[in-house]
Amino acid sequence: DLYSRKIVAWEVHGQECGELAAELIKRAVLAEGIGRNHRPLVLHADNGAPMRSATLLETLRQLGVKPSHSRPRVSNDNAFVESAFRTCKYRPEYPADGFETIDVARQWVWRFVQWYNTEHRHSGLKFVTPQQRHRNEAPAIMRRRVVVYEQARARQPRRWSKGIRDWSLPSSVWLNPMKTASPELAQAA
């Protein structure tokens, strides 16, 4: 989930195929209680064969999910997912020599997803967990942080050269936000 960074679905298989991807998406929609009123709903993916397969695209159509794919040779089109993969691979317990079996890999990924969603205080989310953001608990947490910071500043004003930290989170998140034209460009048009 781009908004919360929560890993809403995952699986480990010995091969990639559109059928497995379609089943994963169906289970994710069911598990997250996503109905047709949750719109717009977009699945952004790389350009791999499973993500472009007719089976997956038809499943997305049936679920009312719009497919989106990374642009060729644009390295940051899937930056949020790449960041999550980096977090995964840099965990101290990540096996340097690979997993012994697929079952061991599945167990490891399950533990990682639990940690990532419920314990990992994400820097891009101002140090709330993806689960807290997903459950809309972040606004209350941010309000409490503002109070704590304001109290600390009131007790020791000389330690604060500026205002308190900005604890606000954006209300919407975009993979590739539209750039607004500068006034000069708007006038030139």
Regions found by a protein language model. Name each.
Residues 1-189:
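Charged DNA-binding/catalytic regions of mobile-element recombinases
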